Amino acid sequence: MIEDPYLGKYVTCVSARSTDKEILKKAQDGGIATALMVYALEEGFIDGTIVAGEGDKPWQPKPEVAMTREEILKARGTRYSISPQISWLKEATRSFGLDKVGVTGVCCQMQAVRKAQLYPINMRDVPGKVAFTVGLFCMENFPYKSLQSIVEDHANQSLGSVKKMEITKGKFWVYTERGNVATVPLKATHKYEQPGCHVCLDYVSNLADISTGSVGSPDGWSTVFIRTKVGNEIWSKAVADGMFETKPIEEVKPGLDLLRKLAKEKIEKNQKTVEERKTFGVNKGLRNPYA
């Protein structure tokens, strides 16, 4: 087991992409999260998974329980807005009758899952049914109205015309169905961030079974951390079955140096906010869960 102060504990780390062309068509990068949940479902590791599906408005995520390949594929791609995934844990087990639940989410949501497993207050047997978690790299997230302001007021694009968004190279990128590409400097988006993101001390979803994101890998590929016994079992079997193409992370650019740099920046910046808030009398609620 490798331990890194900024990247957490992990068994191994690789650069990878799905070999499924259908998944890659609308995947954010290497299609890792989607492909993993499809594979886990088809191989019986999970009965279904909680995903960020399509809401009632353009690019508004909505938590859903996906129980088929098609339902998982509908949730492909990143939606840069808040989706309360964990609120659906009870729904997944009680209304849908799932005994082995998959959960995909960002860092704070992985932390919530692990807290529920340690302290299952008002959850009864639900946490024991979480079978597999895939965590996403996350620097910050935006309320829906904030996302709308970034796209429409700063990028000057209609949210309904957008086919993809991404955050990379210091900019918020917006791609439209007609081929337009607009960018917004990240310094202009900071005021729109969810305030809770400013006390988050995790960038790479340390507490997930497997965590993934684009940073560190070439375009069209994703960086993948295998973190737990469950994650290693599913990943090893999936790779052996030809579900992923992989490269050693040491052989790709920009590699872990950039990922570690960004993780360090987030943690150190947010730790300052945590220390400041301690003076407000809320120190007990801001204990570092990774310490």
From Swiss-Prot:
A molecular function (GO) term: nickel cation binding
Top-tier EC class: oxidoreductase
Annotated transmembrane regions: none
Domain of life: Archaea
Keywords: Iron, Iron-sulfur, Metal-binding, Oxidoreductase
EC number: 1.12.98.1
Cofactor: Ni(2+); iron-sulfur cluster; FAD
Reaction catalysed by this enzyme: oxidized coenzyme F420-(gamma-L-Glu)(n) + H2 + H(+) = reduced coenzyme F420-(gamma-L-Glu)(n)
Quaternary structure (record): Pentamer of two alpha chains, two beta chains and a gamma chain.
Family: Belongs to the FrhB family.
Record's function text: Reduces the physiological low-potential two-electron acceptor coenzyme F420, and the artificial one-electron acceptor methylviologen.
Protein name: Coenzyme F420 hydrogenase subunit beta
Species in which this protein is naturally found: Methanosarcina barkeri (strain Fusaro / DSM 804)
Lineage: Archaea, Methanobacteriati, Methanobacteriota, Stenosarchaea group, Methanomicrobia
